[in-house]
Amino acid sequence: METEASNESIEKSLPKRIALLIQYNGSGFCGWQRQKEGNSVQSILEEAVSSLDPFQPIKVVAAGRTDSGVHASGQVAHFDCSGFIPANRWAAALNGRLPKAIRVRYSALRPITWHACFSATYRRYRYTIYNGCKPNLFLSPWCWHRYQFRLDENLMNLALQGIKGFHDFTAFQRAGSNRPNALTTVEDVHLFRQGDLVSIDIQATGFLYGMVRLLVGQLVAVGEHRISVAEFERRWKLKLREEVREAAPPNGLSLIRVGYETMIFPENIAFDSFPFFSLSTSDPPPSPQ
């Protein structure tokens, strides 16, 4: 009996690992990662968790470190705590202390060896472009407005399909990266138009610093007939970073899903709200000449 009681006491004293599925509007944040100056998603979450649990120190670790202004509808993170609060109640408890720009949709108990970042098998990002000819105040926080021409999504998709596979993406890596190389595997790409919105999904085992925004900037140049598909391929295959100058703005980008060998949250939860607007195709921009 004493041994059982002792084992139970030890079990209760061990830290518990809690996984979170998080959404945030990145507009008002300096990115996910805690910074010396600026409001980060990580710092706000850590303050909220610390206020609810005595386990110290609290560090919230994310699957993807999104940049300043980038959103997330399917970010996954974890932290260790005392277990005082049941795992499935953490979402509601945190939402009561977080600003409206951050919402925790689910919380779950995971083994202490599970890691939000290192256990992930892929990340999926979506970039959304508003291609209507008139400004739209309510879409501007979530989309890049390209109104000059109607984007040629067929050419963009042709260029996009070519990046699938294991490649060196030096052309799409911003300065300041601490990675030893620019090698990664793009597993899936998908470009689709819904009315005046053009969405670009990219799924990879890992992403380089600034990769999606630089890539989208080049795809838009293809879609506006400023460069050819062949020129797009030449730039990235020859690692011509100096010729990849225009990066898409951060507000159109969202981390929409993180994959694991065993999915711990409902698989489609990240797709149920953002960004899937239903727009008409009235008054399209003129086609590029």
UniProtKB/Swiss-Prot annotation:
Organism domain of life: Bacteria
GO terms assigned for molecular function: RNA binding; tRNA pseudouridine(38-40) synthase activity
User: Pfam families of this UniProt entry?
Assistant: PseudoU_synth_1
Statement: the UniProt record of this protein carries the keyword tRNA processing:
yes
Which CDD domains does the annotation name? PseudoU_synth_EcTruA
Keyword Isomerase in record: yes
Where are the coiled-coil regions?
none
Active-site positions on this chain: 67 (nucleophile)
Q: What class of enzyme is it?
A: isomerase
One BP annotation, GO: tRNA pseudouridine synthesis
Keywords attached to this entry:
Isomerase, tRNA processing
Q: Where are the membrane-spanning stretches?
A: none
Residues at which substrate binds: 125
Q: Which reaction does it catalyse?
A: uridine(38/39/40) in tRNA = pseudouridine(38/39/40) in tRNA
In short, the EC number is: 5.4.99.12
What is the similarity comment for this entry?
Belongs to the tRNA pseudouridine synthase TruA family.
Main role? Formation of pseudouridine at positions 38, 39 and 40 in the anticodon stem and loop of transfer RNAs.
Q: How does it assemble?
A: Homodimer.
What protein name applies here? tRNA pseudouridine synthase A
In the UniProt record, the gene name given for this protein reads truA
